[in-house]
Amino acid sequence: MNVDTTSPQAPLAGVESKQDGASNEATAKAESTTHDQNESSSFDERPVHSALSERQRSALLAVASFAAAISPASTTTYYPAITTLANDLDVSITQINLSLPAYQIFQGLAPTVAAAFSDRFGRRPVYLVSLSINMAANLGLALQKNYASLMVLRCLQSSSSGGTVALGQAVMDDLITSEERGRYMAYLTLGLVMGPALGPLIGGLLSQYLGWRAIFWFLMILGGFFFLMVLTFFRETNRSIVGDGSVPPQKWNRSLVQIFRKDKLIANPESLAKKRISVNPLASIQILRNKENFIVCMYGALLFGGYASVISIFATQLEERYGYSQVQVGLCYLPFGVGSILSRWTAGKMIDWNFKREADKQGFKIVKNRQQDLSRYDIEKARLTVSFPMIFATCGFVVAYGWLMQYDTHVASVLVVVFLIANVFTGVLIANSALLNDLNPGNGAALGAAMNLTRCLMGAGGVAAVTPLINKIGIGYTATATAGVWVVTLPALYLVYSKGYTWRKAALEASSQDRRENPDVASGSP
């Protein structure tokens, strides 16, 4: 009889196998836990993005925002005085209107230079120079007596104030991480939208009671006020000069508060940017050469052009349809400002919430006040998921605004819709700007110049086209056509939503492969 001597061993082998499996599984779990702890530790060990407190950062962004408001305010305070200016300078209203697109063209071009110098020498000195030139231009405008002087000085005024918009984007990039950009971006856009909202009211009051020259005296005083604010309180934020804010800048580049009050921050030289950026006025154009940047910038500019045309014709529509005075027209612009302010608590918080929600879905860890590497995060989905509903809402509200005006409905209904347009559109602007900042870390000034260039040129076209279009087809169909253009071109933005992350990964892999194949070039060796 044959005896199977292996039979008794079979169960033991099975037990050993199970024990080995359990042991391996436990080891794997332990290694996984250790890996997660190490990964978490690596996130926590990343340097703090800004050594400044939340209050300090908010204050700096508030100054940057209201300094940037000088640019659009210089446009809109001018609107109520157009007829008076034409009469006093003995020229046609058409000739005076030519100064509007001229202003916007220079407003778009000048920031490319301001951005380049701020990257090299710092934000603060460029603010001070820009505001000084702006004050001089407004002084000349208040004293000038002919049309040629008006055109030249308006272009100078535009060039000096336009740079402050790009500087605001640079300050945002210096201070704020991607996780917080939604709510902080609302601070930055506040001045940009408050300028158009309050400008007509202030311009109407000054023009009606003190004459058109008072508008430029007011703008000169406003520029002087912000010059003193920057001189006294605004500290340098350029990361190649002050790092996370703890490194003292050059003595000539310190605010008066820093000079007379000792800074309690402990200097961290390791937070300084690796190299000082050279002066390159074409940096903003280079940003637009990237297809993702180009699409997002151009769609944002298209939205801005439509919004600018809505603001520009609002005054004349109120005068013609409701017989309002300049002061009443100015008061009707207040819903634009209130709606924009409230976007800080509506759209801004929603954008930050969605950033965190999408990060959790993708397994992307966020650490407060640490700027994470977004190359492995689908940031396009995080930002544009919120943008699309707000874009459709903006389209709907603009159409409603046009037809309410067309049928001369009660002004209260128009003002409610105007409030909603401002609130939702500002949210789109915040999400658009946040995405572009995320895609271009460390290039805030050049990015601001690129955004300003595309928006101002599109805005100039929109403002120039809207009045003839309304005269031909009416404000209802004009508003519908504007919203239609936004909807028809929306697939371009959806392309960024669906393909943008893939494009970035491919570009990153190509860049890594190029460095491996050309190590001498990558290291800078001759």
Swiss-Prot record:
Main location: membrane
Comp. bias regions, Basic and acidic residues: 32-49
Gene3D superfamilies in the cross-refs: MFS general substrate transporter like domains
Localization of this protein: Membrane
Gene Ontology biological process terms from the UniProt entry: export across plasma membrane; xenobiotic transport
Spans through the membrane: 59-79, 126-143, 186-206, 214-234, 294-314, 322-342, 384-404, 411-431, 446-466, 473-493
PANTHER family tied to this protein: MAJOR FACILITATOR SUPERFAMILY (PTHR23502), QUINIDINE RESISTANCE PROTEIN 1-RELATED (PTHR23502:SF51)
Descriptive protein name: MFS-type transporter clz19
Organism: Cochliobolus lunatus
Lineage, uppermost ranks: Eukaryota, Fungi, Dikarya, Ascomycota, Pezizomycotina
Gene: clz19
